[in-house]
Design a protein with these regions (language model features):
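A short, N-terminal "cap"/entry segment at the start of jelly-roll beta-barrel domains
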Residues: 1-43, 57, 124-139
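Short hydrophobic/aromatic-rich beta-strand segments that constitute the beta-sheet cores
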Residues: 32-33, 78, 114
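Conserved short histidine dyad/triad with adjacent acidic residue
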Residues: 46-62, 98
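Residue-level recognition of conserved beta-strand positions in structured domain cores
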Residues: 47, 60, 72, 80-82, ...
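Ligand-binding loop in jelly-roll beta-barrel domains
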Residues: 84-85, 90, 98-123
Length: 139
């Protein structure tokens, strides 16, 4: 079984399609399965899956924004600017308040998936450099 097939089976939600709309804000390949969206719902809810080593850029949620991450598969990382990275595993929950600069993504050798519940707008910033990322220990 390929790693992609294993990742599809490990998650509780479908993998979704390649995350082409946001690819410019990611280092590596991610997949997005929108779970809840619509004008009557004030948040977006989606399952995001990251290939090993994939991570998003530094970013923050603005205009009344916040984000909740519910880890559903694999191993990954979350880091706020100026703080140490936090290792993430299945069952972890991350609460990200408005304006907090952060990034999240997969460990070097693991697929990673989370449900992201996001309100407001996202302000995308610089990429997490390979040098920064390579300093992380193996998860």
């Amino acid at each position: 079984m390929s790693e992609l097939d294993a990742a599809k089976e490990a998650g509780i939600f479908l993998l979704g399609n390649t995350n082409d709309a946001y690819a410019q804000y990611f280092s590596g390949q991610s997949y997005l399965n929108p779970l809840v969206a619509g004008p009557a719902i004030p948040v977006n809810v989606g399952n995001v899956t990251f290939e090993p080593g994939c991570r998003n850029n530094w970013h923050r949620h603005i205009n009344g924004g916040y984000q909740l991450l519910l880890v559903t598969a694999g191993k990954g990382w979350y880091q706020e600017a100026g703080k140490k990275p936090q290792k993430l595993t299945v069952g972890d929950v991350v609460v990200i308040k408005e304006g907090v600069k952060h990034w999240h993504g997969a460990a070097k050798n693991s697929w990673f998936a989370h449900v992201a519940i996001t309100a407001g707008a996202s302000e995308w910033l610089e990429a997490v450099s390979d040098e920064e990322y390579d300093q992380l220990p193996d998860a």
